[in-house]
């Protein structure tokens, strides 16, 4: 029972403390907001008191030799003196006020007290306080020299484009020259399609070695070549040697012939060639020719080269196929 009572007292005390903190925070915030709300009124009152005090001081002051001596100097000194005096923030005199100095304005009695002493430097600063900002002083001798300076200002602005226009006039024929006649390109003559071609492949030994004659003979016979005309090997339509020859195999060394007894024979390589057009489908014959070259290269340990005796690439194979298609189209 005592523990429950103690717990209740702790909770009630915590709630009371929180309520006091919230009340104190709310009260301070309310006082602060009221303080900021009353501050602009105090500023306005203080400004009005300062303005009234300045007016009283100026009315009490007399016109002495010092003030007359300052006006007799150049007007720039008077303007600098006016700029040095602090003015209220709400005073503002638009630039167009000096352009209309002759408009009749009814001034309050305070401004008419010293009518004979217009050169006083204090009047231009205090007069805008007693009258609207857009009403100028009709008797300000310092503002008169400004009006004749406004008229000559636009003259050089309007006269500036004239020499610019004259400068551009002689450049008109240069800016728009007549286009020179462009010679028409000569018509490109279509390259005549070839009507026949020879596709060449090479099977060569690695650099610094030669192909063995006995291994070469076995691989040639396994690829379906038969020794025949011109002492070279031919691949016929039929493996038994019947039918027209599709492509042939010759020695890479001149004169390119072979000796059927090739046990003691060595050579750096052999050349396989096919003449297009040939019997049957030339593209199928080309595939068979490529397979035969790869088989011989694998058996003798050589490599397949193109007609320039460079390593065969897929791009070169596509070039061979394009040549075959071109010949077929020319003979169609």
Curated annotation (Swiss-Prot):
Keywords in alphabetical order: Cell cycle, Cell division, Cell inner membrane, Cell membrane, Membrane, Transmembrane, Transmembrane helix
Record text on subunit structure and interactions: Interacts with FtsZ via their C-terminal domains.
A family per Pfam: ZipA_C
GO terms of biological process kind: division septum assembly; FtsZ-dependent cytokinesis
Name of the protein described by the UniProt record: Cell division protein ZipA
Keyword Cell division: yes
Biased composition (Low complexity): 99-115, 123-175
GO cellular component annotations of the record: cell division site; plasma membrane
Source organism: Shigella dysenteriae serotype 1 (strain Sd197)
PANTHER family, per database record: CELL DIVISION PROTEIN ZIPA
Function: Essential cell division protein that stabilizes the FtsZ protofilaments by cross-linking them and that serves as a cytoplasmic membrane anchor for the Z ring. Also required for the recruitment to the septal ring of downstream cell division proteins.
Gene: zipA
Biased composition (Acidic residues): 51-63
Record localization: Cell inner membrane
Topological domains, Cytoplasmic: 28-332
């Amino acid at each position: 029972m005592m523990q429950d009572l103690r717990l209740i007292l702790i909770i009630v005390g915590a709630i009371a403390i929180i309520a006091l903190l919230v009340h104190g925070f709310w009260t301070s915030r309310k006082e602060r907001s009221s303080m900021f709300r009353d501050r602009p009124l105090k500023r306005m009152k203080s400004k009005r008191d300062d303005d009234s005090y300045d007016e009283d001081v100026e009315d009490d002051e007399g016109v002495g030799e010092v003030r007359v001596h300052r006006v007799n100097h150049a007007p720039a000194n008077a303007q600098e003196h006016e700029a040095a005096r602090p003015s209220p923030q709400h005073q503002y005199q638009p630039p167009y006020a000096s352009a209309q100095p002759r408009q009749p304005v009814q001034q309050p009695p305070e401004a008419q007290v010293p009518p004979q002493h217009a050169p006083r430097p204090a009047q231009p600063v205090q007069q805008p306080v007693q009258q609207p900002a857009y009403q100028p002083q009709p008797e300000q001798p310092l503002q008169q020299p400004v009006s004749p300076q406004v008229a000559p200002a636009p003259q050089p602005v309007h006269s500036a484009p004239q020499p610019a226009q004259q400068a551009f006039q002689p450049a008109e024929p240069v800016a728009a020259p007549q286009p020179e006649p462009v010679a028409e390109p000569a018509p490109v003559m279509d390259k005549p399609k070839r009507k026949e071609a020879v596709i060449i492949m090479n099977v060569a030994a690695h650099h610094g070695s030669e192909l063995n004659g006995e291994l070469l003979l076995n691989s040639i016979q396994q690829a379906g070549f038969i020794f025949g005309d011109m002492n070279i090997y031919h691949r016929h339509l039929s493996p038994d040697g019947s039918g027209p020859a599709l492509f042939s195999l010759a020695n890479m060394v001149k004169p390119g012939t072979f000796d059927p007894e090739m046990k003691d024979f060595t050579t750096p390589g052999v050349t396989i060639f096919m003449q297009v057009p040939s019997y049957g489908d030339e593209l199928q014959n080309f595939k068979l020719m490529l397979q035969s070259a790869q088989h011989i290269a694998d058996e003798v340990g050589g490599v397949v080269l193109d007609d320039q005796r460079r390593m065969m690439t897929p791009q070169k194979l596509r070039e061979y196929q394009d040549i075959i298609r071109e010949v077929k189209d020319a003979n169609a």
